[in-house]
Amino acid sequence: MLRAALSLLALPLAGAAEEPTQKPESPGEPPPGLELFRWQWHEVEAPYLVALWILVASLAKIVFHLSRKVTSLVPESCLLILLGLVLGGIVLAVAKKAEYQLEPGTFFLFLLPPIVLDSGYFMPSRLFFDNLGAILTYAVVGTLWNAFTTGAALWGLQQAGLVAPRVQAGLLDFLLFGSLISAVDPVAVLAVFEEVHVNETLFIIVFGESLLNDAVTVVLYKVCNSFVEMGSANVQATDYLKGVASLFVVSLGGAAVGLVFAFLLALTTRFTKRVRIIEPLLVFLLAYAAYLTAEMASLSAILAVTMCGLGCKKYVEANISHKSRTTVKYTMKTLASCAETVIFMLLGISAVDSSKWAWDSGLVLGTLIFILFFRALGVVLQTWVLNQFRLVPLDKIDQVVMSYGGLRGAVAFALVILLDRTKVPAKDYFVATTIVVVFFTVIVQGLTIKPLVKWLKVKRSEHHKPTLNQELHEHTFDHILAAVEDVVGHHGYHYWRDRWEQFDKKYLSQLLMRRSAYRIRDQIWDVYYRLNIRDAISFVDQGGHVLSSTGLTLPSMPSRNSVAETSVTNLLRESGSGACLDLQVIDTVRSGRDREDAVMHHLLCGGLYKPRRRYKASCSRHFISEDAQERQDKEVFQQNMKRRLESFKSTKHNICFTKSKPRPRKTGRRKKDGVANAEATNGKHRGLGFQDTAAVILTVESEEEEEESDSSETEKEDDEGIIFVARATSEVLQEGKVSGSLEVCPSPRIIPPSPTCAEKELPWKSGQGDLAVYVSSETTKIVPVDMQTGWNQSISSLESLASPPCNQAPILTCLPPHPRGTEEPQVPLHLPSDPRSSFAFPPSLAKAGRSRSESSADLPQQQELQPLMGHKDHTHLSPGTATSHWCIQFNRGSRL
């Protein structure tokens, strides 16, 4: 229609353009001048019509889906066939002849490969191999049964005189027609069953049968066609043996071609790390090459491209990038959808041309009855045999759906068009019968299969992603069943699947996957990775900011009690005691506004950032540039990681420079006492916490190697990141890779977000006023064993403070710091006359508190002080602490 319409529109323009050239030119006249406009339709006719057909098909799908009620009742394939009939009628009325037909060459070489590749590539491999025995039974035995029974029944119908005498066909002709009309079409099955949404087992059995019966269909068609051309009198016994052997050659040869190209495709994508942009192209080219190679060798092309897609997906998906996977998915789906739409439209258009078919009612009705009857009978017989060996048998409802789902489509129409009229005189009758069968199965059965499924209450497919718990249990049961088969000595399906997985893990995966992809294919790490993703999503939903260690509560993390929760003061508070061992000097009660401001401050500091550059002036032919969202996410991640890794850079904590020279450790903070200097000089570290039990070794690349790396690579591997290699300290020292000057220092903390002004204010300067000291008489409280010593010392200290001399109120002056390198002298306490009493922490506690305040001044919240220690620990000094005293003044209350 489009060609005729454009031709009609082109007539006046072409005539106007050709009018000057139609005049005879005299020898003396000059040549015509420059033409402003010329109509060149014939030069762009073929690609223009292809583009228009695809555009019309796409617009038709859009129009169909505008009405949800129509698409819910009528399958899309039926609507496309009806649209093709309408367009074919319009073209026939305008041009007086059928301009467009579904040519077999166009169908087999250009329209069918995308559909089969999409089906094989995205086929659920586990479900396919679980039901492989049933699929092969229905595909091979069922197709042979349908072909021979249908052909023999039609021949018997002709011998009975129910077929018109003008249908000149013998037994071989009817067997040839039965071989092409008995095969279930994958295009029709896929178009109808995807809209019905039957359960996965039914779908994979019917669809797998439609894919794998291609080998049987091709062999039967070629063998019967050869016998027809040879003549029944010239067929020898060896020809029958060759026909049986060709069944194995065509099927196994097609599968072998597909597996070879799948191996090449997986191996090629292993080396495309630096040229990501061509990964989708390689997938389509090598898959199409497998189809053409099998077609060239007269093998099963459908089986070849199916095995190619099924065999390469695991390795290709692991090698290519995420963007390439998305491109392959949507491009493959788009090509398959367009090809399927064009096929059904051309089927409708081809049916309009009455010059290529002849009608015979007996043949048409007999064919419809026989294909339905023998299909149902074959399914029942084969299912009865299969149920003897299946753990989950197929019930009668499943058998009804399988019998009713044997749809015929464009494959049968293309094969009947390829028949030679000189060799098969009844070709026109076979064409008409094939068109009726295709229309009946696609339209009538397609319209009624959904109500039939609802009426029979067939189990539908459940579109939900399995949980991690379900996947773990499935793997567990697989290993248990394989172990049971191994114990009883029965090598069944689970045993061979386990052997194949071991072979794949040991050889194929290491050969066809790059190392980074092979590492992340481990199932345990995969589950652990998804657990981390789930925890991260849960953390973000709770309002946390990126990579913050404060307020982090994840579902998969065990609860940890903080230091404040295990202190003696909190135990007293929970038990209702009136004693306050820390003298209430660090109890800071902030207002709700201050707490809200602090939370908002940390949230904004973690979530907001200043972009480094607004525009990124880079272009590469090998990678796809990042969009704004991806670039923003990367900058946020890099900014947070840089801020948190500054502690490693400053302290050089256990850094093993494996590729560069070890750098000497810089001297830390100046020590203010001689003991600290002496301990630092001797390299002795005392009082290290639990963080120092296992050191973390960072593998850092040198700056020279970073400069020598390829600067043109603008997109890194999706699964690459910062790699932390954790080793024991003893292992690193034994290897001898760390210089002696590179000391091992305590593990740095993760830098928390910057504190607010309210959090920087010291607790005892929060304006709470003078607080009275309360001493509880209940000194026999139940205290944990590890806190008994601190409890006794604290109670004794408070009792001594609660009973000073009555005529004096001692005051303690701040002691000046001692010079470095000298011993700490015993300084007597001066007791001036002052109504207020004062108290000094012991030197060890004062130095520890001073050290902690200096090293962690940026902490948003101060931990509660530990219980007061006795004077007997004055000589104990922690490394790196000062000798200055920390003075705390308080008023004695009248309620002592």
Curated annotation (Swiss-Prot):
It is found in: Cell membrane; Recycling endosome membrane; Cell projection, Dendritic spine membrane; Synaptic cell membrane. Glycans are attached at N199. Phosphorylated by PRKAA2; promotes its accumulation at the cell surface. Phosphorylated by CSNK2A1 in a manner favoring its beta-arrestin binding and endocytosis. GO terms for cellular component: dendritic spine membrane; focal adhesion; membrane; neuron spine; plasma membrane; postsynaptic membrane; recycling endosome membrane; synapse. Residues 658-686, 701-720, 818-864 are annotated as: Disordered. Pfam families: Na_H_Exchanger (PF00999). Changing S709A: Abolishes SLC9A5 phosphorylation by CSNK2A1 and abolishes CSNK2A1-mediated binding of ARRB2. Residues 67-73, 125-134, 195-200, 268-276, 353-360, 420-428 are extracellular. It is a multi-pass membrane protein. Changing S702A: Abolishes SLC9A5 phosphorylation by CSNK2A1 and abolishes CSNK2A1-mediated binding of ARRB2. Interacts with CHP1 and CHP2. Interacts with ARRB2; facilitates the endocytosis of SLC9A5 from the plasma membrane. Interacts with RACK1; this interaction positively regulates SLC9A5 activity and promotes SLC9A5 localization to focal adhesions. Interacts with SCAMP2; this interaction regulates SLC9A5 cell-surface targeting and SLC9A5 activity. This is Sodium/hydrogen exchanger 5. Residues 660-672 have a biased composition (Basic residues). One of its GO terms (molecular function) is arrestin family protein binding. Changing S712D: Abolishes SLC9A5 phosphorylation by CSNK2A1 and abolishes CSNK2A1-mediated binding of ARRB2. Changing S711A: Abolishes SLC9A5 phosphorylation by CSNK2A1 and abolishes CSNK2A1-mediated binding of ARRB2. It comes from Homo sapiens (Human).
